[in-house]
């Protein structure tokens, strides 16, 4: 079975369409999204006239089996994560001023001050509110854990994580799956950590096939226009290998 993972779209409907087309053309039987469907910032992206969060949501609803909530999706939907990573969020968090949020969290969390309004309908917002922060799926005899980032910061809301190597070990202990898939990091290709890498975080370039082992943690590439880093991750459950496919702008 071939499975496609798409992540970190940030309202780039054009690249999402390319990603879905590529996944179907290559024979993906199942498609999953690892979060950050929304979240456009002119500081980080340069396709303001083409951003379309609503179109992205509609495409994912049609083509993806499960979409995971990322930190930007949580912000857009005014949701608080179930996994706070030690941060106390008051119930009126989204009504507080920027400076008050900074004061309460010690500048430890993303506040999204540069993001533009995604102009979503109430139906689209409600859909974002229903997205799971974690999903465990069965595919080709493998149990796979899907999150946007690593426990305890499952949604990826912290500006700086805890200690990712230790957190990944704790993540495995909690969810007990064969593979772990996340997004959030926007790697050039994918990042893998496991026994074969001596638990170091190793980058696997686009187009390079990697044989996975039980317990491996993988980070999929982002799916938004970028000169080097746009693509999808494919998992072949028969050969137990992954391959990242670069998408050209």
Describe each region flagged by the PLM:
Residues 244-249:
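Short, solvent-exposed aromatic-acidic interface loops
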